[in-house]
Amino acid sequence: MHATEPNTGHGSQRAIRLAPSILSADFARLGEEVCAIEAGGADLVHFDVMDNHYVSNLTIGPLVCEAIRPLVSIPIDVHLMVEPVDALIPMFAKAGANLISFHPEASRHVDRTIGLIRDHGCKAGLVLNPATPLSWLDHTLDKLDLVLLMSVNPGFGGQAFIPGVLDKVRQARARIDRQVAAGGRPVWLEIDGGVKADNITEIARAGADTFVAGSAVFGAPDADGGYRGILHRLREAATIT
């Protein structure tokens, strides 16, 4: 991955990463939009893939990933909401994805899917829906680069944050910190769904370090059409000293 490696979170403050979700971007101007979020200070491009099987919506595929890859230098963070998942992993890796995350319910063999992602040169993430238990991490956390906790039920952008997920964030943070303290690999803790300037501080305090925001970013452009203002406000609010 050519940017942004996992951070242990040690030190005076945890590293904060912002990952605008292009699901909320203007698709008629998608190239301009991804350039604008990078110029505005985004750390990742979050790329939601839905297949109308695992979730009841249909979005974008590898061709779109391939098209935006030359336009940005920041990593592309692909979230696969598809079933079955394994066939698409090589396609997105070839298209330029840097991180690929999937839902355990969409894989017949979770460990094998994690290995497939890593074999194709990408960072591997596991996505847990609001009702999916953290026990999925019992035998996978030491192989992951990213845990993505959904704070809405996946399928559509613009949903409200589910407050009950905060306790799950705290528990996941404790698991990651224990692994790192024991000499294990650092893992990003990403949150996706209803993240906004007025709740990101609370989410960061619970332990998240990587924040997916869709409508909160793309619905609040600067006067010049850029996103420096909202990304700065989100980063400031998420920075816990």
From Swiss-Prot:
It comes from the Bacteria. Substrate binds at residues 21, 79, 155-158, 192-194, 214-215. The active site is at 48 (proton acceptor), 192 (proton donor). One of its GO terms (biological process) is pentose-phosphate shunt. Its cofactor is a divalent metal cation. Pathway: Carbohydrate degradation. InterPro entries: Aldolase_TIM, Ribul_P_3_epim, Ribul_P_3_epim-like, RibuloseP-bd_barrel. Gene3D superfamilies: Aldolase class I. GO terms for molecular function: D-ribulose-phosphate 3-epimerase activity; metal ion binding. A divalent metal cation binds at residues 46, 48, 79, 192. Binds 1 divalent metal cation per subunit. Keywords: Calvin cycle, Carbohydrate metabolism, Isomerase, Metal-binding, Plasmid. It catalyses: D-ribulose 5-phosphate = D-xylulose 5-phosphate. Coiled coil: none annotated. It holds the Pfam family Ribul_P_3_epim. SUPFAM superfamilies: Ribulose-phoshate binding barrel. Its EC number is 5.1.3.1. NCBIfam families: PRK05581.1-4 (NF004076), rpe (TIGR01163). Catalyzes the reversible epimerization of D-ribulose 5-phosphate to D-xylulose 5-phosphate. Belongs to the ribulose-phosphate 3-epimerase family. PANTHER family: RIBULOSE-5-PHOSPHATE-3-EPIMERASE. This is Ribulose-phosphate 3-epimerase 2. It comes from Cupriavidus necator (strain ATCC 17699 / DSM 428 / KCTC 22496 / NCIMB 10442 / H16 / Stanier 337) (Ralstonia eutropha).
